[in-house]
Amino acid sequence: MEIKPATLEDVDQIINLGKSVSEFQVSDRVVTFWPKKVLIDCIKSKQNPIFVAVEDSQIIGFIIANYNPSFKKTIIENIFVDPDFRGREIGKSLLDSLLNRLKELDCEYVCSLMEIKDESAVQFYLKNGFNRGINCVWMDRILEDSFKK
């Protein structure tokens, strides 16, 4: 298994994995995963690190982050490992690769959002040195049709 920065050739596999689960859904009006153009723009950008876990030429996991250099802050947007490959520390390897890249970018703060009831995600982040924050309500407004369901 190899962890590497995502390339444009990885986009379709990332989208297929991302659309295969409901964990990324934030409301019933918004697409459940990133539009293809958004992912392509992220991969081309230096501000949006995306790493993939690859085994036998197949992407089996990914992590997507959004770094804001003005605030020196990163939001981990998504982390996913194919259920058939969980329990092998792949999520930790993806997170470690991301954190190393963020240090290179001079990032000073990293956060992520997840459903309160997603205890496995909460435990994953706690185990990897994150602190549990306060409970929040997700609010959104669609400005472009590409995000409509």
Segments predicted by a language model, with ranges:
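Terminal substrate-recognition subdomain of acyl/acetyltransferases
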Residues: 127-131, 137-149
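Conserved beta-strand-loop-alpha-helix junction that forms the acyl-donor binding cleft
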Residues: 112-121, 140-144
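Hydrophobic adenine-recognition pocket in adenosine-nucleotide-binding enzymes
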Residues: 6, 79-81, 114
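Acetyl-CoA-dependent GNAT
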Residues: 5-11, 15-77, 95, 101, ...
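Conserved active-site alpha-helix within GNAT-family acetyltransferase domains
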Residues: 92, 104, 116-134
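Conserved N-terminal entry element of GNAT/NAT acetyltransferase domains
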Residues: 1-9, 145-149
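Conserved GNAT acetyl-CoA-binding A-motif
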Residues: 102-114
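Conserved acetyl-CoA-binding loop-helix of GNAT-fold acetyltransferases
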Residues: 81, 87-100, 127
